[in-house]
């Protein structure tokens, strides 16, 4: 180990930065966030330093490097564009036994600055020892995606509860189980982020009052339309914390590969017109697993609240008193249209967009008169089997027969395929496409030839 990682308490302690440019500004920002009493010495300063000085946040000393400024310092940073000056700062600090960082010169420095993930009071520092700053930055970005944004607030709140936890739970094992449930409780984290004191208190009391073995919850997560890169950061965090993942056919293999390795997986294989597991049984699976104390993720393609029957599943949980939360996903209409070069709205062609199910309950009927209106875009989910009917009804209610249409198969994935034509061809085009597929109807489809960026198919 070439360097010892430490965290410095700099609040109200004198620190010095030599340099007044962009690099020095970035270092100063970190020092100010840490509460340092900061002096900045340079020949010239970029405007941000003057702003900070006018606000009383730091002291500026204009002129050549003055090593007497180090006499009362705990820490120093040399951040000029002059290697000779930087070395003078380092030597002067070394003679006073003051730690000094020299920007872009780790061998001349007595400490190096890591890449930082700040979830105060939780801090994560990543360093390559100065050998590969880009690698450290890339690793930091990866860790940023794994750590929830609200983690700091949860950590602070945990500190307030430590005494109560110690008093209520006698053994280390019980305390560990409590904290494990506490830190993965998404509703608590969201309530803290919203400063919703009532919800925070209610969730906290439930955590303390229920037996440790029966604190399961369900999180509905939208997996997006296919491309794993479209899974949200919060969605990724949830599937990596799950004890069990209940998923269906629209969730891609690439996304399932991101699920925690030791999590149980339950495939329920839904698609339009075919359910490998009936919806009521899915509801009961979620309920049963949560009642066992498990953290259950219900992973759905697209967005769980847009033709995903997420509301029905949550009603079952709500009736049983099971805690739940929802992580939205990019819905198929948004993802497939973007990856097909078809804007859903456009000032010249469409002032509104309608998301329509093509899979109605028996006896159901759509409002075809309004659907056939001009200056809008229609997106039909689960509409392949009804494509001929959609074509017939829209024309019958006045939509122009030459209205452009597109069918997007396996949208946003490497298997994406788009077929397009006009409304009179819709039923025929549907025969060329397999599920999962989306139907887009509107003048905006005509822009695809210019705006298609993702594939030639």
UniProtKB/Swiss-Prot annotation:
Coiled-coil spans are none
Pathway, per Swiss-Prot/TrEMBL? Answer: Cofactor biosynthesis; adenosylcobalamin biosynthesis; precorrin-2 from uroporphyrinogen III: step 1/1; Cofactor biosynthesis; adenosylcobalamin biosynthesis; sirohydrochlorin from precorrin-2: step 1/1; Porphyrin-containing compound metabolism; siroheme biosynthesis; precorrin-2 from uroporphyrinogen III: step 1/1; Porphyrin-containing compound metabolism; siroheme biosynthesis; siroheme from sirohydrochlorin: step 1/1
Renumbered residue ranges of the record's region Uroporphyrinogen-III C-methyltransferase: 216-457
Which GO molecular-function terms appear in the entry? NAD binding; precorrin-2 dehydrogenase activity; sirohydrochlorin ferrochelatase activity; uroporphyrin-III C-methyltransferase activity
Q: Does the keyword GTP-binding apply?
A: no
Instruction: Check the UniProt entry and state the signal peptide residues, or none.
Output: none
**Name under which the protein is recorded:** Siroheme synthase
**What species is given as this protein's source?**
Salmonella gallinarum (strain 287/91 / NCTC 13346)
